[in-house]
């Protein structure tokens, strides 16, 4: 009898210890996480986890020290400063981001994720020393397909997400126009204009750091896959992974 009581007490203590020490983690959607940032910034203090597919990094210079992760609810850009981002965070890898301790901030009209700021910029970067604490590679998404939309169907929920657009022409393309202009011998970030089959337009933004900045733009009809951004009261597209389909 005494032995049974002792075993019961030991089991209860062990269960209590496990309950107290094990953190409660909650998997949430990207859309839910972004909804927490109702102001200019939000410090995450709960054990939220988001899981998704990496669809863009700065490996081709198309983004600036950032990556984009998407799930079925939408997309989220997060600030990352790594010496070898293409190795540590391959495109189309499936990842988990452990968000407790990170920060959501409104940057240029959209919500981004990153580390708490250390300077004047509203968001810090997840650096190599922080990487393993916050990001875990779960595998590879071998059959990722970006959703297809028309320009007229873009909505606020698409900001940060990857989308595909078909039957496009580039308004400025004449066989000689490059993705980026030069000014005083320096390549500069440039906006062009995409036109779809309904004759609607969408600005296309290409960073000066892009690997193909000085390549000629296609004159013929294309499909383009990129990230929807928002700034200055307008949507625009950033092509990722050089996904220009002719």
Briefly describe each language-model feature range.
Residues 1-16:
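Sec-dependent bacterial lipoprotein signal peptides
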């Amino acid at each position: 009898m005494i032995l049974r009581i002792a075993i019961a007490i030991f089991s209860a203590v062990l269960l209590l210890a496990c309950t107290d020490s094990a953190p409660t983690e909650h998997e949430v959607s990207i859309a839910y996480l972004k909804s927490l940032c109702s102001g200019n910034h939000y410090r995450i203090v709960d054990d939220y986890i988001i899981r998704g597919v990496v669809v863009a990094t700065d490996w081709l210079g198309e983004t600036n020290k950032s990556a984009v992760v998407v799930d079925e609810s939408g997309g989220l850009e997060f600030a990352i400063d790594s010496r070898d981002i293409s190795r540590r965070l391959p495109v189309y890898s499936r990842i988990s981001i452990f968000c407790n301790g990170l920060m959501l901030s409104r940057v240029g009209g959209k919500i981004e994720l990153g580390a708490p700021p250390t300077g004047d910029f509203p968001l810090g970067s997840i650096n190599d020393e922080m990487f393993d604490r916050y990001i875990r590679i779960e595998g590879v998404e071998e059959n990722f397909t970006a959703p297809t939309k028309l320009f007229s169907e873009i909505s606020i929920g698409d900001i940060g997400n990857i989308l595909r657009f078909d039957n496009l022409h580039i308004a400025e393309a004449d066989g000689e126009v490059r993705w980026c202009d030069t000014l005083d011998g320096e390549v500069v970030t440039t906006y062009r204009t995409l036109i779809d089959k309904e004759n609607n337009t969408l600005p296309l933004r290409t960073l000066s750091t892009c690997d193909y900045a000085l390549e000629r733009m296609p004159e013929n009809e294309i499909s383009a896959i990129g990230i929807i951004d928002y700034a200055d009261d307008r949507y625009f597209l950033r092509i990722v992974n050089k996904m220009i389909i002719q």
